[in-house]
């Protein structure tokens, strides 16, 4: 198999793009670096496409390695024919490859292997010949011995040999898989008819294999694991065995009838159970891959949410018995004040005293935004905060933010190192405040799996889920870039080319020597060698550096080109120090991007990227996104919602069958996929994303079950 050619065909890319991408990956270049600084070589492939190519490349290389191992193993048995080798070399998947190896694989003890050990394989050959003149019972008499006491035992042993050979036929297994995928049905039923479980929808359920969607597969799998469901894959009567009969039965002679019996046994006992297991495994893997993709997409949107800059924020971690933990952070995230207020259980004069704790913090620090965790006691805390904000002589607002993972972080070693002087509960309040200020900087400290924007994430294969989510975090951190002098250890460790050891060394160097003054100074950091420097240089900014390019995403290797571009447009480096120059792009277009690229000695994609940085040094791509939705008015409760009511909310989670929207009543409403838009969409992610502010209308409210049905389709007038 020519892997580069296969990748080019699969991804519908030029061969040159694939060849260059493979060369860069094999040279140890990171995906963020390739996506940003090697666009000319890859044809401007983005990080998501590059990751897909890398994953597929690893699979195909693993496939080729396995083919080599199998050919070597069969050759050692003296059974590798040119035809078999050609089939193995041409196999497209690991499953297909293993099918071809199955007849030659060292076997455990089976009915067929025991029959062969008793010398019954020659009898199996006689039966398979299906000679109309052959008398099976007479032929069997020649094989009787101590372990084969009669002709019935001899014929049964011979049929066992045939059944296993039929079930191991690679072409037949492929046909059977196709049949199950096209005509099979997945069925589930309750293990206890009247049991009250979350899986009641699947107590008497059947759906064609080819139509069942991922989230239903995962639900059925979980129900089976928890003992609530029994699950099976079925075929229409007679469909499966007929494949074997058509292939192996030549006539209805006495031998032919025994071969047919062996074929039916092969189907029922060996082939179909194996294909059923494989089919369910394949469905689960497909569903898991899709669910991981949704989780990754949701995480990407959450991490790339617009930060709330230049605001002093109060973080509130709600609670009942232990009170609400409070933390005020300044514009940079530095903790200014902490406290506890028992506002959810106090009454009368006692409640007013507790409110005063928050009042004083709000006024003392001129807090303009409050972040309230959405966990226990959030509702009561929100009511008090909304009331107190109205008393302020200046404008302030609040937002209920997800607490997911905050408790995990606050009890972690990382949090203890960052805030040794605070107890666990106060660290959580700090984290909640910072999540509103800069979601990316705060959420990278938390295991992505704890952030809670997926579906069935606890059922996903851990390694695949972790790799996908870590890739998203890496892409997001590098896309935004970090300030070398203020970035936390967590942020630094996700920068291309920087591992945890180098990240710690950067923080240590900063502590011992003061702030970095330019990018070159980074070379003094222990373990940060030339290769790592090449990978990370463009993603680490130095604000206030003597060379203003050090505060941009322009890679040091392109500084000469950047200065040439400035010169062509009539500017000098000093002209972009600390100020935006939006006119540079327009001037460059007048000169012609192609002409400038030739003079600067770089490609057009690099010129365009450099121009963006020169127009706005230190730019944050998240600033171009809509700001988070803050609330300041009266809060609503579930009972206040009525069908037809128009609301504005924030998408909190996107799943296969819809999205959940926070409309400010503490129960997220579900917009079913059919209610997202008028056009047909296969998946909600085609139309909405996590963090997006959307307009919705109430369809129905179930107060008893605390469920809200919403639509994003405007009501028809008249």
What is each PLM-predicted segment?
Residues 30-31, 46-145, 149, 337, ...:
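Accessory alpha-helical DNA-binding modules that contact the DNA backbone or grooves
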Residues 33, 49-52, 59, 63-315, ...:
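Duplex nucleic acid-engaging cores and interfaces of nucleic-acid transaction enzymes
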Residues 139-151, 205-206, 241-267, 271, ...:
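Low-complexity, acidic/Ser/Thr- and charged residue-rich accessory regions of DNA metabolism proteins
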